[in-house]
Amino acid sequence: MTPVSGAPRRRYSDDMRGRRSKKRRRAQHARPAYLVNADFALRSADAVLAVDLSEVPLSRVNQFAVGWMRAAFEQSRVIAMLTKGEMGHATAPNRRAFWELAVRLLWFAGIARSEREKAADAMLAHGRSTEKTTHTHMQSMGITSDIDIAAMEEFVLDASNEKAMREQVKNLTEAVMATEQNLGVIYRLWREDSTWAHATAFLAGRYAPAEGDVTMGVGKPPHIDRDLEAHRLATMAIVISAGCILADEGVPSGLASAATLAFYNEH
């Protein structure tokens, strides 16, 4: 009997595809976790940052959601690149910014829609106050300031007058405490990385450790979340939070979820 044309070839082709797939999975499992997660962070950052959100209606709330999300994925990209280059221990400033952005997006998403615009304006008012302080300090030091105070004053804000909201805007700890979700893990990582992101005594001791109370050695600060496991989970929370805010603000579902879909297509 003449065999059915192509059947053996098809089985062979399927077998080969299965073997190649298993080989890729074995190779993936053989790689260190920090490299696997760094590669994922790079792919997902590229995917999210490439999403065209120009059709999202312009509003302060939408700007905060999209802007913070993009900033977080830019930091994620830098952290991943330096981690792959064996410089992960030096990324504390980037990690600190990343954790803070994650907290802020989760906090912002947890605010009632009716209060979200006032919260955004409270953030803007706090930023304006900080810029004014910077302007004053520069003038007192005899340094020319290019901060246009008059232009900032012309910007009308409807900031929340609630003391609790103002404190949450100024103090990240208060924002964490006010968020319904338990942000304890992200907050702990932010606090830890804050130690290594500033000119602290601990940072000096890590880079120039004492050896036997006689000589000064060479060292590095600890690499928090070395394998980027918490980082990977945080990127999920970030992109989902941004999408939820946009959807809650009435952005069409396809557009509101575009970044989330781009992110999960990299899984």
Predicted ranges, named:
Residues 2-267:
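A cross-kingdom marker of C-terminal helix-rich interaction/assembly modules
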